[in-house]
Amino acid sequence: MEKVVIVDAVRTPMGRSKGGAFRQVRAEDLSAHLMRSLLSRNAALDAREIDDIYWGCVQQTLEQGFNVARNAALLAEIPMNVPATTVNRLCGSSMQALHDAARTIMVGDADVCLIGGVEHMGHVPMNHGVDFHPGLSRTIAKAAGMMGLTAEMLGRMHNISREMQDQFAARSHQRAHHATQSGAFRHEIIPTAGHDADGALQRFDYDEVIRPDTTVDSLAALKPAFDPVNGTVTAGSSSALSDGAAAMLIMSESRAASLGLPVRARIRAMAVVGCDPSIMGYGPVPATKLALKRAGLSLSDIGLFELNEAFAAQTLPCIKDLGLLEQIDEKVNLNGGAIALGHPLGCSGARISTTLINLMESRDVQFGVATMCIGLGQGIATVFERV
C-alpha cells in the first residue's frame, strides 16, 4: 500500500463573518486562491498531473453550491482534465476530504491530490435552509440538532464549570494572539485580498477574529447563549463565526521523491466514529483512540494534539478523557483554536491539520493528532508523522 505524504499545507486568514474582511469575497475565490498558491509554491508539479481535488464544504448552496470544488478549480485555471468533488461530513468535511484522497492514493488509484475546504459563514449561514425531518425526534433528542445545547449537556456530564470554560476560552485568544505576534502563523497563512472597514481593498495576512483583550473577567460578564436559565456556555466560550479556507497538497511518497518535493508529514492513520448525537462533542475521544490503535501508537507517543474548539464545554471533556488535562499547556492547541480563530465549518479539518503540521515542525515533534467533533454525533481523527 502506498504511503501518503503531506507536501504542503496552507490557509487563508480567518475573516470575521459579520462585516469582516471577506464580506465582498466569495467562497470560490478563497478556495481558488489557495489552489493557485499551492501550485505556485510547488512548481515542480505540473498541474495536469493532479489526479483529483477533494474539497470540504457544509452548506452546499448559493455560492457554495453546484460542486464548489469544481467551480474553484476552474476559477484557479487548473487544467480542465483535473476533476474535483465536494465533500460533506459537516464539521469534519475537509478532514474527510483528506481521508478520501489519502485512501485513493493508498490503493493506487491516484498519485497526487489537492484537498481542502471552505466555508463563508457570512454569506451562507450555518442554518440556511436547514429542515430536519420531524421524525428524527422519535430516535434522538430534539436538542441534538442544537450544537450549543449538546455542549451544555456534555459540560454538565463532566462537571465543567463556567469558570473552567472562561479560562479555556481566554487561553485560546491569548495563545492565538501570541502566535500572531511571534510570526508563528506566517508559515501557514497565505495573504488574501479583502476589504478593510472603510471598504478599501487590501491584502490580509492575519486572523481578524482573534480578540487579544479577552480575559476571564470579560468573559464572565457574558450571558448564557443557549440555555438562559441554567446554562454555562456563552458566545465567548463558543467557536467564533468566521470565513476562511484551508488546503493541502498530498501525494504518494514515491511521487514526492521523484519530483524532488519536500515531505512535511506522513499520514500514519485515520479514523471516523459515531456517538450519541446529544453529546456530539465527545466524538474526538473514540475517534482518537481508534486512529491510535490503527497507527500502533498510544496516547503517550503523541507530542501534539489539535482539537477543534467548537465549545470550551465540549473540548474540555475530550481533553479530560484523553488524559491530557495535566499536559494541556505542553501538548494541546498551543496556538489557540476555533474559539479564537473561528470554525468555518468546511475549512476547519484542513485548518487544524495545517496548524498541527507547522507546530510539529517548529517543536520537532514526531507524532501529532488532529481531531474534531461533528454535528449529529460523529468524530474524526488523523495521526500525522514527521519524516
Curated annotation (Swiss-Prot):
Catalytically driven reaction(s): an acyl-CoA + acetyl-CoA = a 3-oxoacyl-CoA + CoA
Entry GO MF terms: acetyl-CoA C-acyltransferase activity
Pathway(s) where this gene product acts: Lipid metabolism; fatty acid beta-oxidation
Known EC number: 2.3.1.16
GO CC, one annotated term: cytoplasm
This protein's UniProt keywords: Acyltransferase, Cytoplasm, Fatty acid metabolism, Lipid degradation, Lipid metabolism, Transferase
Major localisation: cytoplasm
Localization terms from the record: Cytoplasm
InterPro entries on file: FadA (IPR012805), Thiolase (IPR002155), Thiolase-like (IPR016039), Thiolase-like_sf_Thiolase (IPR050215), Thiolase_acyl_enz_int_AS (IPR020615), Thiolase_AS (IPR020610), Thiolase_C (IPR020617), Thiolase_CS (IPR020613)
Active site: 91, 343, 373
Any one biological process term the GO annotation gives: phenylacetate catabolic process
Assembly and interaction partners: Heterotetramer of two alpha chains (FadB) and two beta chains (FadA).
Role according to the record: Catalyzes the final step of fatty acid oxidation in which acetyl-CoA is released and the CoA ester of a fatty acid two carbons shorter is formed.
Family that this chain belongs to: Belongs to the thiolase-like superfamily. Thiolase family.
Name of the protein in its database record: 3-ketoacyl-CoA thiolase
Species this chain originates from: Pectobacterium carotovorum subsp. carotovorum (strain PC1)
